[in-house]
Amino acid sequence: MSARDVISKGEAKMKKSIESFQHEIASVRTGKATTALLDRVKVDAYGQQMPLKQVGNVGVQDAHTLMVQVWDKSMVAATEKAIRDANLGLNPAAEGQSIRVSIPPLTEERRKEYVKLTRKYSEDSKVALRNLRREILHALDKLEKDKQISEDEKSRGKKDADDLVHKYEKRILDIVGQKEKEIMEV
């Protein structure tokens, strides 16, 4: 294995970490209706916790309304309860086999809470990136110790790892800035 291989594997893991962060942050509420808002909702269905997506279709009806089309009529009440209990500040209303979820405007206090949550997610992602960097550096040290790479290759690899971390941390900051702007938009 070469230093390039170690860096490539590390970068692939960093990309996955960023994708995970983007998915995480998509579920943070803004003033607009988005299907990602209900991604984390788990419904008590058939004796187990199931993601909402496995119980019905979620669609955007308009800028402030989501519509959940439940496939099994017997699951409507459980789905409505799961959305209400998800601590998202939503008030779902059942209409036959569908559930209308109105997205109320965010209060200033709630907006600030969501900004804090967004920043927490970004910090968690940065920590994950730094841990991946540590893994890369450890692998490079091991390769040098085993005489598979030279000291120069190791130091180039360390510089590349640092550059990757800075690149992806900047990406996280850009994503957070955009999300904060969306959250604070009235």
UniProtKB/Swiss-Prot annotation:
Key words, A-Z: Cytoplasm, Protein biosynthesis
Keyword Ribonucleoprotein: no
Pfam families: RRF
Keyword Isomerase: no
Organism domain of life: Bacteria
GO molecular function: ribosomal large subunit binding
A GO CC annotation given for this chain: cytosol
Main location: cytoplasm
Coiled-coil region list: none
Record localization: Cytoplasm
InterPro entries in the cross-refs: Ribosome_recyc_fac, Ribosome_recyc_fac_dom, RRF_sf
A biological process from GO: cytoplasmic translational termination
Family that this chain belongs to: Belongs to the RRF family.
Function: Responsible for the release of ribosomes from messenger RNA at the termination of protein biosynthesis. May increase the efficiency of translation by recycling ribosomes from one round of translation to another.
HAMAP family registered for this protein in UniProt: RRF
Name by which UniProt lists this protein: Ribosome-recycling factor
Species this protein is from: Prosthecochloris aestuarii (strain DSM 271 / SK 413)
Name of the gene encoding the protein in the UniProt record: frr
